[in-house]
């Protein structure tokens, strides 16, 4: 593991692409958390005595073997909420800027090409951040500035709208926002493939953050230890249909109740052993339940 201090914008600029693994929970920040970040950014931007504002860590591991000649996706173990929220704010700000820089490095084109896009790549490789299925198409639609998909992510749209409205209230006085964004600081934590245990690190990092739901914990426990292709197959064939069936609004509440009911049955007392030796059978049985 290697941990270094980094400015968020510098970190985004030099990184090619972040991918959120399918075992991660969906984007879950509320307006309250976005408002707190907004207030912190504006405060830092207005005060010369604040040189930096720390917003947390971003922990990642290379998805596969590093390739100099192409995009090398980084799997995000911790920091999805911060990365996604920052990109929603940057996208909203880019729509209020022209081609002239209002502050060093802050023009519509530079914000998009530095922090949101890989402008010389095509398809999904052309985007800095790929979220999980529930959120991915919504974020990409915003960045492409196209209509939202039919089953769009409410969190993505609501938080983007919040930032867009806050920026509109600033009028032409955008320099404090730009200065504040430039002061955001993270801890850049790169894991070593084959040496660090992503599951243990994920669990320890989330022990002090927003509590994971029962469904999130079970999904992570099942999928995180599997090979990527195995993860994808189980998620797309069985877990994703359950998420869709419960819907975005009811996922946490009703899916959690469902999981507690299912795992509370006497017939499931050996659930941990069952999941470890037969994850496919467990997920398929859960899907049919």
Regions from the language model: what does each represent?
Residues 53, 97-125, 129:
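Flexible phosphate/Mg2+-sensing switch loops adjacent to catalytic phosphate-binding sites
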Residues 83-99:
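Short active-site loop/helix that positions an aromatic residue
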Residues 130-289:
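Polyanionic (Asp/Glu-rich) segments that form extended negatively charged tracts
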């Amino acid at each position: 593991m290697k941990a270094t201090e980094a400015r968020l914008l510098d970190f985004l600029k030099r990184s090619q692409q972040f991918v959120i693994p399918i075992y991660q929970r969906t984007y879950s920040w509320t307006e309250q958390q976005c408002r707190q970040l907004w207030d912190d950014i504006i405060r830092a931007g207005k005060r010369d005595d604040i040189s930096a504002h720390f917003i947390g860590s971003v922990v990642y591991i290379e998805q596969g073997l590093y390739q100099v000649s192409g995009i090398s996706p980084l799997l995000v173990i911790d920091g999805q909420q911060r990365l996604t929220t920052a990109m929603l704010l940057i996208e909203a700000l880019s729509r209020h800027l022209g081609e002239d820089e209002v502050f060093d490095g802050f023009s519509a084109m530079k914000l998009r090409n530095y922090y949101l896009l890989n402008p010389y790549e095509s398809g999904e490789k052309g985007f800095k951040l790929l979220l999980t299925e529930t959120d991915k198409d919504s974020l990409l639609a915003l960045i492409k500035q196209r209509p939202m998909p039919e089953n769009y992510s409410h969190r993505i749209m609501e938080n983007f709208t919040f930032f867009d409205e806050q920026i509109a209230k600033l009028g032409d006085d955008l320099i404090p926002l730009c200065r504040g964004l430039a002061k955001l600081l993270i801890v850049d934590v790169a894991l070593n493939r084959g040496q660090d245990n992503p599951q243990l690190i994920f669990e320890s990092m989330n022990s002090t953050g927003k509590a994971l739901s029962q469904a999130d914990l079970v999904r992570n426990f099942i999928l995180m230890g599997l090979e990527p292709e195995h993860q994808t197959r189980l998620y797309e064939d069985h877990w994703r249909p359950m998420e869709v069936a419960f819907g975005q609004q009811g996922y946490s509440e009703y899916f959690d109740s469902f999981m507690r009911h299912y795992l509370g049955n006497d017939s499931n007392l050996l659930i941990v052993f069952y999941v470890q030796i037969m994850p496919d059978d467990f997920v398929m049985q859960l899907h049919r339940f």
